[in-house]
Each structure stands twice: as C-alpha cells, then as structure tokens.
A protein has these predicted regions:
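Cyclophilin-like peptidyl-prolyl cis-trans isomerases
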Residues: 8, 12-182
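Bacterial N-terminal signal peptides that target proteins for export
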Residues: 1-8
Length: 182
C-alpha cells in the first residue's frame, strides 16, 4: 500500500513538472501579457506565421505594446488592441504580407487585425473569446493563449452599437517575450 502511495505521488508530481516544462518549452516563442487582472501566457506560432511572429517579437522587445489599449472589445467575439492611436486607425508603420493558414479561430486564438487589404496587417491584433469560423483562412493566426484566458475574459467590453468601441479602455500593462524575462 505504501509503495502504491509513493508511486501515485511520483506520477502526480511528475505531471506538474511536465506541465511546467511544456509551458516553458520554447521561451523565445512565448509571450507574457500582463493585464489588470493577471498574466496571460501566449504560445506564438512561427510555424504558421513566421513574418508576423518575428514582427510581433520585434515590437514587444521595443516596448511598443506597453500601455496600449484594447480599443475594440465585443462580448462573445473578441478583444482588439495594439493600436498606438487607440482608435483602430494606427499601427507601427510596417505592413506585413498575409500568412493565412487553415488554423481555426478558437477560444484564445490571436490573429492580426487588418483592413480589407489582406496584406495590411501591422501591429493590431485580436484575441477571440469563442469559436469564430467566419475568420478562418481570412486573418493571420499567430498565437494561442495557453494560460490566463480568464484574465482576457475580464477585459472591459465596448458598446456594441458602436462596433465594440470602448470608453476608458483597459490597457496592456506590459508584454514581454518569456526568454527576456529575468
């Protein structure tokens, strides 16, 4: 009986160790997004969108996203941020060619916002709250929330009659590439 208890304890603790390793498996392609309610861990997908992931990391390392707002948030759909103007019209000034894939937009997917021009993505991104099939193959998927989606779900919602525009919007407190965090 004692051996069984020791074995079960080892399996239990081993499961925790493996999950920690899985979260930190690729710190160069993991983002840590700090929101008012807590930290969100994002697995970036350079296998799906190498140019977008490279540009996001470049902007993150410049501190570009720190303090920017989630200017457009539609309940049951998504939260959009990454615009230095805070109104959906701004960016970093560098457009990225589309890298569409067959990766579905499921809860926690990060994808690039853009205009009607498929190659107009810049710095703005959105996180979907629920399965959004109508986006599949039309927007560049570059990441997935792996931890902290409950914090994303608490981002202040916008006025649906104004296409989700948020008065006094929540901000990105800080965004970092995990490998850069000491």
């Amino acid at each position: 009986m004692a051996r069984l208890a020791v074995f079960l304890l080892a399996v239990f603790l081993g499961g925790f160790a493996m999950s920690d390793e899985a979260q930190a498996a690729d710190p160069e392609n993991t983002l840590l997004l700090n929101l008012k309610d807590g930290q969100v861990v994002i697995e970036m997908r350079p296998d799906l969108a190498p140019k977008h992931v490279a540009r996001i990391k470049e902007l993150v390392r410049q501190g570009f996203y720190d303090g920017l707002t989630f200017h457009r948030v539609i309940g049951g759909f998504m939260a959009q941020g990454g615009d230095p103007k805070g109104n959906g019209t701004g960016g970093s000034g560098v457009n990225i060619p589309a890298e569409f894939s067959d990766q579905p937009h499921v809860r926690g997917t990060l994808s690039m916002a853009r205009s009607s021009d498929p190659d107009s993505a810049d710095s703005q991104f959105f996180i979907v709250f629920s399965r959004s099939r109508f986006l599949d193959g039309k927007y560049t998927v570059w990441g997935q929330v792996t931890k902290g989606m409950k914090h994303v779900g608490k981002i202040k919602r916008g006025d649906e009659s104004r296409n989700g525009t948020v008065d006094d919007p929540d901000k990105i407190i800080r965004m970092r590439v995990a490998v850069d965090v000491k």
